[in-house]
């Protein structure tokens, strides 16, 4: 039997998706640049070791069933698979998923599969199937982030971990993440983020509480444009990360 990374297209009708067509087109148009370390996705490659170390420290992923929601070109999914996790990456940006699949084939990563499916649709099909769910840099790109949080909570097993990272809706975030990163430093393509879609930590915490995800750890992430270095901090005014754990008694 061939042990190749698996790709499934399980795409529901577009009108029912919790997705912004403009956002999907944006990331699909850049699909060929996902694995260019000096391209538009350079910031994701730079922060990936920090995200991975933090996740793996709180919940070692080796041997775990892991779901990466909004996986894009597979940067985080690939890294978790290399640590020994059984990883499923899902996204609705078709071209980005094809890039992720090709990279997995070239890297010969048999414990990594991809599906083109919404997180809500997968939650209806496979509730309680994963030990760990990651949803990184994705919530600020969807019309209904609370729906994504609920689906993530449904997909994880009781006692399992769900990790989120997103951007705070704050004046500092507007200046640094939009004006600075997109228009001054050109770290990201212009239009990557919309201020109105950013999410305050208090809002994300409320979404989590409503679906019995207990907040265990919060971290911020900062960037020095002179040294081009990212690091973790306690400052959540721009980029921040949540580590949550599903209540053992939760039934969604």
Curated annotation (Swiss-Prot):
Metabolic or biological pathway, per its Swiss-Prot or TrEMBL entry: Cofactor biosynthesis; ubiquinone biosynthesis
One family name in Pfam for this protein: Methyltransf_23
EC number: 2.1.1.222, 2.1.1.64
Disulfide-bonded cysteines: none
Highest taxon of the lineage: Bacteria
Catalysed reactions, as listed in the record: a 3-demethylubiquinol + S-adenosyl-L-methionine = a ubiquinol + S-adenosyl-L-homocysteine + H(+); a 3-(all-trans-polyprenyl)benzene-1,2-diol + S-adenosyl-L-methionine = a 2-methoxy-6-(all-trans-polyprenyl)phenol + S-adenosyl-L-homocysteine + H(+)
Binding of S-adenosyl-L-methionine, residues: 51, 70, 91, 136
UniProt entry keywords in alphabetical sequence: Methyltransferase, S-adenosyl-L-methionine, Transferase, Ubiquinone biosynthesis
Record carries keyword S-adenosyl-L-methionine: yes
EC category: transferase
GO biological process, one term: methylation
GO terms assigned for molecular function: 2-polyprenyl-6-hydroxyphenol methylase activity; 3-demethylubiquinol 3-O-methyltransferase activity; polyprenyldihydroxybenzoate methyltransferase activity
Stated family: Belongs to the methyltransferase superfamily. UbiG/COQ3 family.
Its job: O-methyltransferase that catalyzes the 2 O-methylation steps in the ubiquinone biosynthetic pathway.
NCBIfam families associated with the record: UbiG
Database matches in PANTHER family: METHYLTRANSFERASE, UBIQUINONE BIOSYNTHESIS O-METHYLTRANSFERASE, MITOCHONDRIAL
Name of the protein: Ubiquinone biosynthesis O-methyltransferase
